[in-house]
Amino acid sequence: MSDTTSANLDRRSLLKLGLGASLMLGTAGLTATLSGCSSSGPAGNMAVLRESDLPLLAALFPAAVGPHPAFSENSNAIELAIAQLDRSLQYSSPFVQSEVLNLLGMLSMPLTRGPLTGIWGDLAQASPEQLEAFLLRWRDSRFELLRKGHKSLLQLLHMAWYATPQSWAAVGYPGPPII
């Protein structure tokens, strides 16, 4: 009968584990780099948001906010909301900026997007029904991390959307008082 607690076997197992983990992390890093998911600077007209975040956010706003007259009346309503989100992030802490960019990066990277959202293609090309289903799946997930991701994502999108004047008329808000 072999001794499974020998030091020789433990070292071998440790080396195998280390080699396997190194290969896995190296492959994930290479995939992220080749897929354009490596950290990059802000988009040309943005202070925090990256170029890869913009189409993703443009697709998520209608799914998060729901049907809104401003989406059909004002062709640049979503762009204005994205700009508002960028301004809000600009004045938040570096930690918050980093966490938001990590969340958006995770949703942009094909390796993580499919298993986490159920949408295997590009999120910017997904139908509103697919995006709503993904958001509901996160909201009702048994995993706390996905529920927190849902809550954070929706709070950010709602905060940015309802801070823009084009959203006010539909909810009966006349705007801030003139002083």
Walk through the language-model features, giving the residues of each.
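Short, well-ordered alpha-helical packing segments
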Residues: 18-19, 31, 135
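C-terminal segment of N-terminal export signals and the immediately downstream linker at the start
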Residues: 7-8, 28-70
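Short, functional C-terminal segments
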Residues: 2, 163-179
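N-terminal secretory signal peptides and thylakoid transit peptides that target proteins
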Residues: 3-25
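Flexible, low-complexity segments enriched for small/polar residues
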Residues: 50, 54-163
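A short, amphipathic alpha-helical segment
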Residues: 2-3, 158
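Short linear motifs in low-complexity, proline-biased tails and propeptides
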Residues: 23-28, 163-165
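Glycine-rich, flexible loop/turn motifs
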Residues: 45, 119, 167-169
